[in-house]
Amino acid sequence: MDFFQYFFRYYWQLVYMICLMLYITMYILIYNFTGKTLQTVKYFLYPSCTAMLIAMTMAFATQTRNIDNTHSMALLCDGFCKYIGPTFCFYCYNLYTAFGIVVNLINLHTMYYRTLCLKYLDAKKVRLWTLVFMWHYLCPLIYLIVIITSPQRHLEVSMETLSLHPNFDYTPYLTFGGFSQAQKELLDKAAMSLSLISMYYPLIGTYWKHKAMKMLKSHMSPNTSDATRAMLQTLIKGLNFQILLPMLRYIPLTAIYFMIKYTGEQFLISQYTITVLGTIPCILDPLVQIYFIRDAIRKFLACNSSPVRRIYDSWASRMII
């Protein structure tokens, strides 16, 4: 085993334990500190936290090392999935990819909902357009269905990998497979789509952030408390930061993808980075949510404890409830 194999074997155990503690903390905060007045928040926080937990669990289950071949891409898995077989590892890897996209969509969906709450006074119209956004979730679902239902040829992938990279130590990975030639073509198209998504998420998220901040300044009552103003602005900025987090994954992955295509060579460290880079948002995202949930709830409850302020803050509080 080389240095990277030893390093990432311990890396995954440490990172997964940290993430588990963060997600447990998130569930406790959501359950105990978001009551009836903050009911709508749960509709976004629970799915977001669950999707992150699933994505991180699938990443831990695979602990994938990606080998880019001429006609295929091998998945050398060092997680517990390797004891079940290459087909199970293949499913876990694609679930990790799909739920990683879902997390990003939920964050974008949350920002969209906040903007709608400021734009429309009619709650029915807000719910309608919030539901319309849900067609975005068809994208990871279609990707998952297409890639999983396509023919799997793990033996061919394994044979090509062994012939092209005979010097690698394959003993820790047991029996492995990966994406066949047809699946690799789909994967290449998906990589191109991710490069476009890496621009779409921050652009549309930043647009909605500026739109929401502008409406906050123009619509908010002069009698609205300073705490409510600060809380709403901080909440929107926090959501925008969450939307930008995936760029920590997509930009390096896109750069690595084009570098491999241009040079025709894959550096050793790049074989480990595809799955590892996905763990960065999984760690930072719950940290951001934990911070802003506690801060937003504390300020919201402080504002609503005053009967004088409550009347003037009712419009602004729609951003949360």
From Swiss-Prot:
Predominant subcellular localization, coarse grouping: membrane
Transferase among keywords: no
InterPro entries recorded: 7TM_GPCR_serpentine_rcpt_Srd, Nematode_rcpt-like_delta
Gene Ontology CC annotation, any one: membrane
UniProt entry keywords in alphabetical sequence: Membrane, Transmembrane, Transmembrane helix
Subcellular location per the Swiss-Prot or TrEMBL entry: Membrane
One Pfam family named in its UniProt record: 7TM_GPCR_Srd
Keyword check for Transmembrane: yes
Residue ranges of the TM segments: 14-34, 41-61, 83-103, 128-148, 190-208, 240-260, 273-293
Bilayer topology term: Multi-pass membrane protein
Similarity comment text for this entry: Belongs to the nematode receptor-like protein srd family.
PANTHER family with a match to the protein in the record: SERPENTINE RECEPTOR, CLASS D (DELTA)-RELATED, SERPENTINE RECEPTOR, CLASS D DELTA
Name of the molecule in the record: Serpentine receptor class delta-63
Source organism of this protein record: Caenorhabditis elegans
